[in-house]
Amino acid sequence: MKARPRIAAGRIDVIVDASNAAAWNRAVPKLDAQVRRAARAALGTARPKHRVGRMTVRLSGDRDVRRLNHDFRGKDKPTNVLSFPSGDVLGPRGALLLGDIVIAYGTVAREAAAQGKTIRDHLLHLVVHGVLHLLGHDHQRSAEAARMERIETELLAGFGIADPYVLERKRA
């Protein structure tokens, strides 16, 4: 069986909303570069038919994410990360337009503090998690959740980030 080519990121746009830019930049040094590295690491796990042409990571705040969560998921509260896959939309020269990820600063900061981790570590985990959702991974079934967690844990180790699921496994 012939292996499919690995995915390659053409363009990863990182958009930091002006209302939260100071907080994001203060919490995560070299923000754009770190977010791009985490996204590329997650993209490197896929083997789709097409090269990625473009994806966006939008670093926002709770108000915007709450609105998006309400509009698209019917949940009137902020969440840490939302992923909006584009499906199989092809751009110029057959490049796949992967989709968008939106991450809420306030929720990320609260969760990081509650879990005893840095905002940077939690952000990079959510970038990886969000990209895996864009690639079609899900965690609705336990087998797929375990696979997704394994991929995340392996990728995060490359950034010097401890297994984010270790406490959940100990409680189970």
Whereabouts are the PLM-identified features?
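An acidic/histidine-cluster motif and surrounding catalytic segment
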Residues: 1-123, 134-172
